[in-house]
Amino acid sequence: MAETLRLARLTAQVTHDHPEGIKGAQAVAAAIFLARTGHSKVEIKAYVECKFGYDLSRTCDEIRPTYHHVESCQETVPQAITAFLESTDFEDALRTAVSLGGDSDTLAAITGSIAEAFYGVPENLKQECRKRLTPELEEILQACENMLLQR
């Protein structure tokens, strides 16, 4: 986990060099690490709340009515993590994140990264998405997948 948090800090400093931006990146990276290493949603939630101080007690139904486009980590990362925590599978995670409104592409990107680590991506969805890639992008994706499989 220490290496995950260190790398999250280093990568966040390039584009989000603010304490809250770094904290958000580390919280997401920690959730991904925990999901990828077989931890439960309860454990992921507890770790993020304890380590980063995010309040993950509100449900998506409670967030949705008042949520709007916000460009701060403290009002994006917890909501994205909550969408993952409430989900039942990868697609449900993305749909839940988008349903919150606001900066929905960012929410879905964050939620999706955690959901991929926890659930994996359904093969039919992978195939459908791959149909839309150029050969060059397909080659890059394959290289990234191969690199991850070696870890």
Residues covered by each model-derived region:
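Acidic-glycine-rich active-site phosphate/pyrophosphate-binding loop
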Residues: 1-7, 47-60, 80-92
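Inter-helical turn/loop segments and adjacent helix faces that build the functional surface
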Residues: 1-19, 35-43
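Catalytic phosphate/nucleotide-handling subdomain of diverse soluble enzymes
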Residues: 8-14, 27-33, 75, 80-151
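Short, surface-exposed, polar/charged, turn-prone segments marking secondary-structure boundaries
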Residues: 19, 55-58, 137
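Flexible, glycine/charged-enriched surface loops at secondary-structure junctions
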Residues: 20, 41-44, 107-108, 124
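Small-residue-rich helix-loop
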Residues: 25, 29-32, 36, 40-68
